[in-house]
Amino acid sequence: MQMDWLFIAVISGIGLLSSGVPGTQGAYTTEQCRALNGSCNFYACFPKNVIIGKCDWWGWSCCARTPLERCTAKKGTCTKTGCTKTDTDHGPCDGGAQCCQRDPVKYCKFHGNVCGRGKCPMDHIPIGEQCMPGYPCCKRDGPAYCKSKGGKCLRRCSQIVPTDIIGVCADGVPCCKSRQSTG
């Protein structure tokens, strides 16, 4: 008879652990905890994690990374000034800061450059940054671009008569192209 009561008590205890303890309203289900980028752990959280609530099992806590750890895992940095147009916003950090990560494609294009496919286009040169692995960020090479358009880099376009300025080779040096006769 005593073994029957002990058996019932053990089974009841297991049932409480697996189905939630009555009176823990407001506690997270496992799915709710996961939706908050957390996990239900028994009593203690892993290092660098914080308790963000209770799970609906007795003695379990919903643990998640700190905002700084979450940001670092996404290769971002927490900044108080907010994200720029060339950043990807990964959400809030502590103290009103934002988790920002430079988007290499946006950054390359924002500065007037292009992303090459394996290599830069003929009239461009790589600038040492990558849009993504195997895709260099390429800057237009003024002299090569000028030459590809049939022009010449000259300090004074008046050396070619008649002439049009069709671009810039470098600071202060125009790309000059002779006008075609309209005969």
Curated annotation (Swiss-Prot):
**Is Signal one of the keywords UniProt gives this record?**
yes
Location in the cell: Secreted
What InterPro entries does this protein map onto? Answer: Defensin_beta-like
- Could you mention a single GO BP entry for this protein? defense response
Intervals holding C(6)C(4)C(9)C(6)CC repeats: 27-64, 65-101, 102-139, 140-177
- What molecular function terms (GO) are annotated for this protein? toxin activity
Family that this chain belongs to: Belongs to the beta-defensin family. Helofensin subfamily.
Q: What protein name does the entry list?
A: Helofensin-2
Which organism's genome codes for this protein?
Heloderma suspectum cinctum
Q: Which taxonomic lineage does the organism of this UniProt entry have?
A: Eukaryota, Metazoa, Chordata, Craniata, Vertebrata
